[in-house]
Amino acid sequence: MKLEEEKIIKEIPANHLRSLLAIGGKLKLTSKTLKFKPHAFNIGGKELTFNLKAIDEISASHVIGPRSNQIHVKLKGEDFRFVVWATQKNEFVDAVKRQIAQNK
């Protein structure tokens, strides 16, 4: 049986917020997953992979402050936050939502 290859749909620069740390890297949407890959020079950053079927909610928010343009990814019992460019935030969230709907 041949496994379906994941296709990259969209990739944007992002910072993964972990308490007081902001780990720089990239958010990548594929046909099956949402991935965060930190830059190689980041200390303490780790790669994250979320199966699209496991994502309970994804949303864009705007709060006041230096980490204002955020994408929130919610899974069962876990909440992940990423800071992205304001111009890319809504478009990326919409693309993830479309891909989640296609994977149901």
Residue ranges: model-predicted function:
Residues 53, 84-91:
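A short, sequence-level motif marking secondary-structure junctions
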